Amino acid sequence: MTEAIHSQYDSILILDFGSQYSHLITRRCRELNVYCEMLPCTQKIKDLDWKPKGIILSGSPYSVYDEVAPRVDPDVFTAGVPVLGICYGLQEIAWNHGGKVDPHDKREYGHAMVEVVKHGVPHLDALFKNWEGSVQVWMSHGDQLSKAPEDFVVIAKTPTAPFAAMAHKSKPIYGVQFHPEVTHSLRGVELFDSFVDICACRRDWTMETFIDKEIKRIREIVGPKGQVLGAISGGVDSSVAAKLMHEAIGDRFHAVMVDNGVLRTNEAAQVYEMLSKDLGVNLTVVDASEQFLSRLKDVEDPEQKRKIIGNTFIHVFEAEVAKLEKQAEDEEAAALAAGKPQEAKGKFEYLLQGTLYPDVIESISFKGPSATIKTHHNVGGLLEDMKLKLIEPLRELFKDEVRALGKLLGIPAHLVGRHPFPGPGLAIRILGPVTREQVKILQHADSIYIDEIRAAGLYDQISQAFAVLLPVRAVGVQGDKRTYDQVIALRAAATTDFMTATWYPFPAEFLSKVSNRITNEVQGVNRVVLDISSKPPATIEWL
C-alpha cells in the first residue's frame, strides 16, 4: 500500500468557488514550501480521508445572496483548523456567521490601499503581523460586507470598504476582501506566509524531498519485477517523468519516442542523445514519419489533423509495444530455461503519463472543465486498448516545480527550460495541408527564429516562441525577379501561467535580423510578419 501524499506532508486545503485566481492560491502556498491541494467548494469535510492543517476559501464570480450561489460546507468552521476566506470567501464566512453582504454602489476593481488595523491581541494581529500603515492590494468585487458578524473584528479597511479584512474574536478564522494571490497585491506573499504560520505547517514541500518519496512510491506500485511503458515527446514533462521513472526502476522502464515527421529540426536525434546516451533512459525511437505524413496529406482542418496524429500515434505505439512485450517474453523464457528465475522480469502493467497539477485543477474546478477550444493530444486511448494502468508521478506538480525537479535529476538546463511544444507538432503550425516540403520550410524558419532568440539571450525571458507557416502567398522581389512565395508569422508570448499572455516586445533590430535571415535562407518564403495578439482574445497557438 503506497503512502498517501497527505500523510507525508502537512497540507492546506483550498476550496475553489470558481475564481479565475484559484490556481494562484495553490501556487503561492507551494512557493512557501507547503503542500496544498485544491478541491471544488462542494467537497464535504467529513468525506475527506485526510485532515488539512488549514483551509482557504477562494473568490468566486457569484454573489453570496444569489439562490444558485455555491455554499461552503458548514463543517469547515468546526473542523478545528485555521480558515482564510479570500474575496467571496470572506463574504461566505460572514454569511455563515450572521453578517450581511450587499451589492455596493462603489465597486472596487484594481489597485486599492488598505489600512491595517492592529488590536494588540496576538491572534487578531497574526495575519498582518508584519504590516504597518497602508499597503497596496488588488480588489475585484462588486459586493461587500455592510455588516460584520458579531464575533468578528475589523483588521483592515479602505475608504470605501470598512470591512476589507476581518478576524474572529476567538477562533483562527480570517477573511480578506482583496486578492493576496495576485502579484498586484504587493505584500500578498507575506499574508500567505503568516497564514501558514497560523496553521503551524511544516515547510518541507521541496523537490529534494519529493524525489526520494516519489521514487519510493513508484517502487511500491510497480513492484520488484513490474515493467512500465512511456510515450516520450522530448518535451519537459515527459523527459522529467522518464528520468524519474528510470531512477526508480532502471531498465524496467521502456520509453518510446515516435518521430511523426512534424517534429522540430533534428528533434528525435537530439532527444535520443540526451535521454538515452547522457541520462541512461531505456529509449527506443520509431521513425514513422512516412506513415504520419501520408495520412496528413491534403488535410487542412486542425481538428482532423489532431485526430489523425492521435490515432496514428496509438497505432504506431501499440505496434512497438507488441515487439517489446515479445522481447520480454523471450527473455523471461530464456531466464527460466537457464534456471535463473530471479532474472525474469514481469509483464508490462503500467503506462507513464506526464500529467501536471494544472490538468488536475482544470478537471476538478467548481465551474467544471472549460468548453473545449482544442482537442488535446494525449495517450488516453492507449489505456483502453492496451488495458494498462496509469502511473502519473508528476500529477501533483506545477510546471515550475517540474523544471526544478528536472534540474535535480541532472537533466541539462537547456532541456528543462525548453518552451512548450504541442503534441501534434508542426502540423498545427502549418495552416494548410501538411507535406514534407511544407514541414521542411517551417522547420528551417523556426530553427532560425529560435537560434536568434537564444543568441540574443532572450530565450529564458520568453514563455513560448515559434514560427507559423501561413496558408497564403505574397508577391515579392528577390534577385530582381518577381516572386510569389509563402509567408511566415512569428509568435512570442510572455506569461506566468499560460492562462493569460502578452506578446513579447522584441527590439526592432532583432526582428529585422530574423526577417532578413528567413527570407534569404529559407527557400520559398519572401515575407515575415509578427503576431502581436494577447491571450485573450487569441490563444498562444494559432490552431
Swiss-Prot record:
Glutamine amidotransferase type-1 domain location: 11-205
Reactions mediated catalytically: XMP + L-glutamine + ATP + H2O = GMP + L-glutamate + AMP + diphosphate + 2 H(+)
Active site: C87 (nucleophile), H179, E181
GO CC terms: cytosol
Pfam families per record: GATase (PF00117), GMP_synt_C (PF00958), NAD_synthase (PF02540)
Cofactor(s) this protein cannot do without: Mg(2+)
Protein's GO biological process: GMP biosynthetic process
Its job: Catalyzes the conversion of xanthine monophosphate (XMP) to GMP in the presence of glutamine and ATP through an adenyl-XMP intermediate.
Name this polypeptide is given: GMP synthase [glutamine-hydrolyzing]
Species of origin: Mycosarcoma maydis
